[in-house]
Design a protein with these regions (language model features):
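Glycine- and aromatic-rich loop/turn segments at beta-sheet edges
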Residues: 280-297, 326, 332-348, 392-426, ...
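Glycine-rich phosphate/pyrophosphate-binding loop
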Residues: 200, 204-232, 418-427, 431, ...
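Terminal accessory carbohydrate-recognition/targeting modules of carbohydrate-active enzymes
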Residues: 1-267, 271, 297, 304, ...
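Single conserved hydrophobic/aromatic residue that forms the stacking wall/gate
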Residues: 618-631
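Short, solvent-exposed segments of well-ordered alpha helices
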Residues: 224, 228-231, 293-300, 346-350, ...
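Aromatic (Trp/Tyr) and acidic
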Residues: 2-82, 189-194, 220-221, 418-431, ...
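Catalytic cores of carbohydrate-active enzymes
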Residues: 273, 391, 398-401, 442-550, ...
């Protein structure tokens, strides 16, 4: 039985099928994303969504959807599905679905009377193109397929509406057409692998709604332009391939291209293979530069997310070359930042105070997976430069105090991963001595000291160790409270007593200022108050301001973002901490916990982990939104 298969009963029940979504990407940052019944419910959904660099730094929906119609004996059966005003869905093509399977590639099987039609979609890896193969599995009379493309040509953050500026011009190409609605956009080529008839019948389909945007309090309707439709005859056993891309392709190559792309895929036939496939989706190549996107569908390459996620996305999969390729770009961006030069790389938020420390942590994982000697040869100079940059107090918002701790101003702008804002201000103004920033600092000092000592630089190693001694003593004095857990941040006489997961890093890191008994106390409190089946809570239910309900308009969600929701990415560090305390005896717990996460592969964003969980009903609030740090 297929690992990711959904039967007719689930598919025709929109309450079950609409919340389940699929995402496929390529390394240019383009993607295809929709629900498993091909009904778009978000403005970010689309069949072909691509970056258009000459316009802006956003992705753009070119082809929103493709409605198929099966025609026999003059009778038409439309397989499309859109939501309109008043909870009205049309043309209700989901009622013909017999099953949906995405173990290999997303495959939908329709049954219309005596017709069985299989639709398979694949997003091409190395160019901005989606291919859809239709196979007539069974039919008892002459059959025609009609394809009606719904065009948007707009940013994923905007909507399009009927307007006179949209160009209706098109030109015939081999077995298809090319068209472009607005200046600055690339031409969209829509072709089939066999001869067909294109009927030019331009029209706007008005009032299409996106209920997920409505839930968030945003505008939620738009008009989509349909230039006409393609018609092609198909025989029993025959396959027809539809292509949409930004360059022309030879129709004779479409079947071969489809087959080669399928052969290149790793099936999502297990929990591990699902995670592996999802991990690969965050890689982004732009010319010679290699980035890691923070998440889909809207995040760009953010520095903190890059360094936290990079070991899991590469080294955990045995992909050392990929790690080095990304770090080659990241290292250049780091040096530009350290030298005060304008950024020429698309890695955002490099100025955040914990970013360089997370970079050291990422390189520490590289040293563990390869060797310290290899890490020293590759990145030894960079590690020394980062620590020196911080130690010499050259960072604009990272101040090394005499007590050895790093002080950060986070009152006006969010400066850590808990970065939600409302009305231009941090929802959680973490400021002063921040617990994970100083845990990272201690870890970096000890790690780099050991590295340079092994390289023969005893003087620098002794200097860093001396600094670590001061930092470690102050860390315990400042952060550890009478109840055995750690303050989340301390600013003068203001101590944040909230029980948050950021203290777990101090137990998880290779070097910690806490002794074993102190580590166990921290782990016990995190386990008791923050551990859930879906990740660590961002705030204990016993702490003031606890709110696990990530629902409603965006402003309401912003306030709840880090106030009780559970985040899967934190579990990696929790498990590291658990194994440091319980050693081999803790392995069975880790295994059981991971097995409990496997049911997420068939919920919400299929085959992937979500960014966060709403814990009020233990369900996912952001099913499509995937973050690289979750892997």
């Amino acid at each position: 039985m297929s690992y990711l298969r959904f039967d007719k009963t689930l598919m025709i029940n929109l309450q079950e099928s609409l919340p389940r979504e699929i995402l496929r990407t390529n390394r240019s940052g383009a993607y295809h994303c929709t629900t498993i019944v091909d009904c778009n419910t978000r403005k970010y959904h689309g069949l072909l969504v691509i970056p258009v660099p000459n316009l802006d730094d956003e992705n753009h929906v070119l082809l929103s959807s493709l409605d198929e119609t099966v025609i026999q004996h003059g009778a038409e059966f439309n397989l499309g599905l859109h939501k309109y005003q008043g909870n009205h869905f049309s043309p209700n093509g989901h009622k013909y679905i017999r099953e949906f399977d995405c173990e290999n590639i997303p495959t939908t099987t329709y049954r219309v009377g005596g017709v069985i039609l299989r639709k398979e979609k694949i997003f091409v890896h190395h160019e901005n193109r989606i291919l859809i193969r239709y196979t007539l599995v069974d039919a008892h009379s002459a059959t025609t397929l009609r394809f009606r493309p719904f065009l948007a040509f707009r940013s994923v953050r905007e909507y399009t509406h009927e307007n006179a500026q949209a160009s209706r011009d098109y030109q015939l190409v081999e077995n298809g057409i090319k068209t472009c609605m607005y200046p600055g956009y690339p031409e969209l080529f829509m072709q089939l692998n066999k001869k067909n008839e294109f009927h030019f019948q331009p029209d706007w389909y008005r009032g299409i709604e996106y209920p997920k945007e409505q839930e968030r309090g945003y505008d939620f309707n738009e008009d989509l332009y349909v230039p006409g439709y393609f018609e092609v005859d198909i025989k029993k056993g025959e396959s027809v391939v539809f292509s949409a891309g930004i360059s022309e392709i030879s129709p004779r190559k479409l079947k071969q291209t489809f087959e080669s792309e399928v052969a290149d895929r790793t099936p999502r036939d297990s929990f591990y293979h699902c995670l592996k496939n999802s991990a690969h989706q965050f890689h982004n190549k732009q010319g010679e530069e290699h980035y890691v996107l923070a998440g889909y569908p809207w995040f760009k390459c953010r520095a903190r997310d890059l360094f936290i996620s990079l070991p899991g996305l590469t080294l955990a999969l045995g992909e050392q070359d990929e790690f080095e390729d990304v770090m080659k770009t990241a290292e250049k961006a780091i040096r530009e930042f350290i030298n005060g030069e304008p950024s020429s790389y698309k890695i955002y938020e490099m100025e955040h105070p914990d970013v360089l420390l997370w970079a050291v942590w990422a390189l520490q994982q590289y040293a563990k997976e390869t060797s310290r000697e290899n890490c020293r040869q590759m990145y030894g100079n960079l590690l020394e430069e980062i620590v020196d940059y911080i130690h010499e107090r050259r960072h604009d918002n990272l101040f090394l105090h005499e007590n050895g701790l790093l002080y950060t101003n986070g009152t006006e702008k969010a400066v850590t991963w808990m970065n939600s804002t409302a009305n231009g201000r941090p929802v959680i103004p973490r400021t002063g001595y921040i617990v994970e920033v100083n845990a990272l600092w201690y870890n970096a000092l000890r790690f780099v000291a050991d590295m340079v000592r092994e390289g023969g630089n005893e003087i620098l190693a002794d200097t860093l160790d001396a600094q670590a001694e001061i930092t470690g003593k102050s860390f315990v004095d400042v952060f550890r409270n009478e109840y055995g857990y750690l303050f989340d941040y301390v600013d003068g006489y203001m101590m944040d007593w909230s029980v948050r997961p950021n203290m777990i890093f101090t137990v998880a890191f290779d070097y910690s200022p806490l002794d074993r008994a102190q580590k166990k106390q921290v782990l016990d409190i995190v386990t008791k108050e923050l551990l859930t089946p879906k990740g660590l809570r961002t705030l204990s239910p016993k702490s003031g301001g606890y709110n696990p309900n990530y629902v409603g308009p965006q402003i309401q969600r912003d306030y709840a973002y880090h106030q009780g929701t559970a985040w899967p990415w934190l579990m990696g560090f929790y498990m590291e901490a658990y194994l440091r305390i319980y050693k081999v005896s803790g392995v069975s717990f880790v295994e059981r916990y991971l097995i409990g996460m496997e049911d997420e592969m068939t919920s919400h964003c299929i085959g992937a982990l979500p960014e966060l969980f709403d814990l009020s009903l233990i369900h996912i609030s952001e099913p499509t939104r995937q973050e690289a740090i979750s892997y």
